Amino acid sequence: MSSAIVAKLNKEDIIKDTVKDLAFEILGELSVSYVDSDDIKLGNPMPMEATQAAPTIKFTPFDKSQLSAEDKLALLMTDPDAPSRTEHKWSEVCHYIITDIPVEYGPGGDIAISGKGVVRNNYIGPGPPKNSGYHRYVFFLCKQPKGADSSTFTKVENIISWGYGTPGAGAYDYIKENNLQLVGANYYMVENTTVDFNYDM
C-alpha cells in the first residue's frame, strides 16, 4: 500500500518538488475530507470554494506497532505552486501547521488529527491567483522526535516561503530543521478561473 501512495505522489512530482531528498517511510493512509465534498484521494481536483474551512483529517496506520502512545505527530499543509507551477517566487506557501497531535486510536483503528494537538499556524484555504493553473495542496504527517519540546520548533511568521526568505523553501526545510519524520501524505488540486484576489506580499 505504501508503494501505491508513493507512486501517486510521484505522479504529480510531489516528492521531487517538496520533500526532495528526505528519507521517509509512509506508515499509513492520511485521510482528508471537506464538508459536502469528495474525500481527498491523492491528487483529485477540488472546487476552491469547498476547501475554505479546515478539513477533517485522520490517519490509519498500516501497523499500529509503528506508532506508540509516547509518540506525537505534526501536520503540515503547503502549496509549492505559488504563484504558479512554473513561477515559484512565493513558494512554498504555508497553509497549516499543527504539532503535538497525540497517538490515540479510535474504534476504527484510526488516529484523529482534527481538533487535536497545538495549532501553530491557522488553516488558510486555497486562494491561487486567477488563471494560474492547478495548484497542488499537500498535507504531510510527521512524527516528532521523542520528548521534543515543540515550542522550540521553527516559528513560521511569514507564510511566503515559510519565512525562510528563499523561493521554493517550505515543508522540506521545516521537516529537516525540526528533525521530523515523514510518515503520511495526501494532496489535492485547485484551480481558480473566476476570482481576482489582491495579495499583500
From Swiss-Prot:
GO terms for cellular component: cytoplasm; nucleus. Signal peptide: none annotated. SUPFAM superfamilies: PEBP-like. GO terms for molecular function: peptidase inhibitor activity; phospholipid binding. InterPro entries: PEBP, PEBP-like_sf, PEBP_euk, Phosphatidylethanolamine-bd_CS. One of its GO terms (biological process) is regulation of proteolysis. Present with 6230 molecules/cell in log phase SD medium. Belongs to the phosphatidylethanolamine-binding protein family. This is Uncharacterized protein YLR179C. It comes from Saccharomyces cerevisiae (strain ATCC 204508 / S288c) (Baker's yeast).
